[in-house]
């Protein structure tokens, strides 16, 4: 069970500090910052190449979803062994790219928020194909097991795209407006977070149907807010952050029992996972601080600081 976009962590960490227009590198053992790269714009999320030697980062532009300032049209290409900016891919139009994933064929997929689309990019030629999804795409996940891409469009449904045909084929209706989404390592289960409810929705990726609704205990269901979700690479845990509540919750993936929750610093966003399988990371965007915490208990083990606006973190081995 291996997900190209959610591999076990490595001895190195890379973190986006989007407000500062920087990317940081850290030693995962010591949490010492080992390098910083200046980015050409506000770089939000990253996807790694199959060989783990390249990171692709979406340059969304400044501001936040809907309240964009100078929306961008680029994807940065970072060489991980040399920790250098190798080049920049121009998407051909101002799309405000955000969520980004790599498929098994080597195609890079990203959201094209301003184009109501997802984009399929060939990193070898920089050719870009636009696939209309009928709404402001913000995040996506790839299920190689089913040959589908699932797309969050900040509505009360998730769009489904055929990976090979590169066209939208379905929409999965949900009880509330949703935003954050994640996928199990085997590609069989999609997890989606309610934006207008403190709920986690569990979708069967093959049947394209809602299977279960899980309450997020300790989160405020009356606030409309961004929630993000990730599944641990070993498929043991599901973690959820609630951005305005400064709250994180941990669920057992088997049965989805909530086993822990903890308070965070301001504006928790993206999760990453440590190589030991016992710890995870959480970026607290507004306080520019990353938590390392125990997955089994939620206990905070260590913290470290970044430049302004940490959003995304991933471990790697190159």
Locations of regions flagged by a protein language model:
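Predominantly soluble domains enriched in secretory-pathway, periplasmic, or organellar proteins
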Residues: 1-318
